[in-house]
């Protein structure tokens, strides 16, 4: 018998043309720490819709001007969500979501129907390569985050393997975020509570800047402690956890040309929950309760050289990450662990040219990174862990991209062709090595007939190399009862068990995609009031994805037959490949994914409204079955009123989902839902209380019982939230 799992885990106007000098000043150093604004400016940024994207083209541009879809969620919007985890903010991003359920330890992202190895995660440019069948991937506390970029669509032309569905890039806080002009030191302290899981949070940030502005330092420490999650269904989801997060970052500017920075970020999590923390999986035989310890460290160094010449704007980044998850079974002596280390270095440069009405930015560079994994299980003879091979992967890449803009009588045209070459190698002890390479081209184009209108399109190819987990998976996968024979204690005792083993497959080939996208956007200012703005951008995309990697699980059907149900010639039930009782990753499916995404934002001195819409469909080309991490049609709205020159903001959010019937098994269909949140922010911008911020709110105000499709469990119920913070500069 074969059980088949899901095959795929898987806004700027003409004025941007004149801002080229400003973005050049930001330069490639923005890949690690983008150009910043002081806290007084950031506090008023709730209406600043001209967010800058760093990762969409590796060259800072306004997100609106990108020839595709990218969302930039800035610090002020993140803070208004008063998030417990980064998953809380993803309603603000069309076409992207966090699945795996409400437990922090099981949250995984998906973008445009792809997840797992199909989505690249970057922390300040450092790749986060930790991947597990059931564990989460977001080892970062929201308190440390100054912006999140979600580039949707294939981006292998810049980032290589893994950017099949898109890139989620997290940018962490800097000292500049906390200091006004002339201030040399500052502190921020905060404390918060939310009722749905009885979570308390405390955090402290300290910053310092030298008299000559050449050196600055920022440090943060945050602790969260929470209990079980109260679901909208009325049930509790076991999820006791404690999170300790810290960040230390320093920047040195010896001259106007040079910027050097270094950082260390740590995420430590301890929780008591089932071995598989995703969905509504209860603890029990085969999914024992574990004391889970997460230790994630990211160290990074960055050097930017940006002299007066237009030919050099170079950025060198080196990083090391270590992510270790250890699980001690509560009721046994078994301990298992997975450790993934990544060392990487990238070098890129931007050369800029201008000739009359034309300008060209040529971005080019190379990258190398190495992943190494070690799995341990103290209950196996050789201490190795089933499904977690001791293996290494190496990636070498070189890329080039041109951004050519020409301003003529019919508007501004921009053409952005790019290409990247990658070579990748996988090795494991006692197994054959694998080698392959890929070329990933992409081209995007935009046209602005007038400054307020943008028309764009793009085409690109992307790939996702097979991971060492998929190629070299071996040892025990799971055990099942063998009902076809009496148990060791006879017919009235417990059954005998047989073992399903992983089988390596060195013949896997990369997943590949070809995507095209077309869209348009509008950008207006001074519509109803002086200084107000409205932006909207939408697109339709279609992706053809081939060679999808799927885990095939084969079990002899006779294992489920009693002795009196057996018939002559029936294959025996046993353990391993000899009996057909094995699991193996194979290339099995070609899929077509398509969808629509729309974002719109309005802001004024009196009120704001932002929202988005997304729909997606995914089909198996061979049999028309649904494939991918699909979701219902989604509408998200976030709006509110501003009082006392913005010192007080009252807002509300609503998420609306249609009925979900894009399923192969009717049992997996889900009803639609409408969920609303309310919130208030008091943040005096002047006077003696400047620096104080009070956040009050309630999520899921109606205590709705609803399921997010990719979560597999009812979502958290009504959740009252409160946070108080104070910031002072000196």
Predicted regions and their residues:
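Acidic, small-polar-rich N-terminal luminal/periplasmic segments of exported/outer-membrane proteins
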Residues: 27, 35, 46-180, 198, ...
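Membrane-embedded beta-barrel scaffold of Gram-negative outer-membrane proteins
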Residues: 191, 213, 219, 313-329, ...
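Conserved C-terminal beta-signal and adjacent last beta-strands/turns
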Residues: 6-10, 15-19, 23-25, 125, ...
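Gram-negative outer-membrane beta-barrel transporters
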Residues: 349-351, 360-362, 369, 406-408, ...
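Structural signature of Gram-negative outer-membrane beta-barrels, strongest in the C-terminal barrel
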Residues: 255, 386-543
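Transmembrane beta-barrel wall of Gram-negative outer-membrane proteins
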Residues: 193-225, 234-274, 291-305, 403-409, ...
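Flexible loop and strand-edge segments within Gram-negative outer membrane beta-barrel domains
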Residues: 226-227, 232-233, 237-243, 257-314, ...
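Short loop/turn motifs that connect adjacent beta-strands in outer-membrane beta-barrel proteins
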Residues: 44, 159, 175-185, 211-214, ...
